[in-house]
Amino acid sequence: MGTEATEQVSWGHYSGDEEDAYSAEPLPELCYKADVQAFSRAFQPSVSLTVAALGLAGNGLVLATHLAARRAARSPTSAHLLQLALADLLLALTLPFAAAGALQGWSLGSATCRTISGLYSASFHAGFLFLACISADRYVAIARALPAGPRPSTPGRAHLVSVIVWLLSLLLALPALLFSQDGQREGQRRCRLIFPEGLTQTVKGASAVAQVALGFALPLGVMVACYALLGRTLLAARGPERRRALRVVVALVAAFVVLQLPYSLALLLDTADLLAARERSCPASKRKDVALLVTSGLALARCGLNPVLYAFLGLRFRQDLRRLLRGGSCPSGPQPRRGCPRRPRLSSCSAPTETHSLSWDN
């Protein structure tokens, strides 16, 4: 049983996607979890398929629009927006596998299990880290218009940051890539994360803590710091667009906290129990399992919401999307074709207007 002590009921990037009918946790009595298992089989496929449909459609449009407009290399934010859409698109591609596994069991073998689990984990982490990159880009875009502001980032530097983010995400995905496997459970094949017997509880807990710290705490800290500075700039600015830009800032931070904070807290509490080898009563263990299922589903929702928050709110993106749907595209040269928007010049006088590009008109 020791090898399965960290198997959780969520299909998140820290665990397998199914629970045991009998708990593998250190419980004071045998705990039969058929009711939790039944809830998981109903809840997980519905959430996975809904988010997959929204994520594939929304992020597919973002990728197609940016590539058609050839704006991906013009600014760091455009480059990171493209990477964010790619990460969310890859994440959405893994969700139908989770839904099928929950409904009828896993039938694709251990190699595919490790591949899908690793892709899920890497894209999940990459998405949150690119959100932090976009926040930092927005702060630099405003601060560089001020006296003694930081030097603007170059597209080449943005591409280097993107490579680092993906490498870090792959590092965080190593447990899923190495230890996910196909196995029999209660008469059905399951794709689960099962740590080797020789791995201590401390190592398992430290892995989960590192993922929460880098996958949630770091991006949240960067977002709050950058948007707080941007909010202060907006409060000092004048113009009719100031209030709308402030609402965008609040919406971005609030969406991140509401969607990801509950799952991160639930996972931290579960990790604390693991590290302390704390015993739970059967009802408490069931409540924890349901909480992990529901909050991990909530965390997945940002895969479908990111295109709305970070792209569709942008005026220039909507213009590019309409042009794409009409079958046109814009060249990337200094003299754009008729109907293609010009990139505004940034000056100290235009800082409030550039701040309004918090709706990501880049």
Curated annotation (Swiss-Prot):
It is a multi-pass membrane protein. Residues 69-78, 137-159, 226-247, 314-362 are cytoplasmic. Residues 1-52, 100-114, 180-203, 270-290 are extracellular. The chain crosses the membrane at residues 53-68, 79-99, 115-136, 160-179, 204-225, 248-269, 291-313. It comes from the Eukaryota. Keywords: Cell membrane, Disulfide bond, G-protein coupled receptor, Membrane, Receptor, Transducer, Transmembrane, Transmembrane helix. It is found in: Cell membrane. One of its GO terms (biological process) is immune response. GO terms for molecular function: C-C chemokine binding; C-C chemokine receptor activity; G protein-coupled receptor activity. Expressed at high levels in adult testis, small intestine, fetal lung, fetal kidney. Weaker expression was observed in many other adult tissues including spleen, thymus, lymph node, Peyer patches, colon, heart, ovary, peripheral blood lymphocytes, thyroid and spinal cord. Also expressed by melanocytes, dermal fibroblasts, dermal microvascular endothelial cells. Also detected in T-cells and in skin-derived Langerhans cells. Disulfide bonds join 113-191. InterPro entries: CCR1-9-like, Chemokine_CCR10, Chemokine_rcpt, GPCR_Rhodpsn, GPCR_Rhodpsn_7TM. PROSITE patterns: G_PROTEIN_RECEP_F1_1, G_PROTEIN_RECEP_F1_2. Residues 328-338 have a biased composition (Low complexity). Receptor for chemokines SCYA27 and SCYA28. Subsequently transduces a signal by increasing the intracellular calcium ions level and stimulates chemotaxis in a pre-B cell line. This is C-C chemokine receptor type 10.
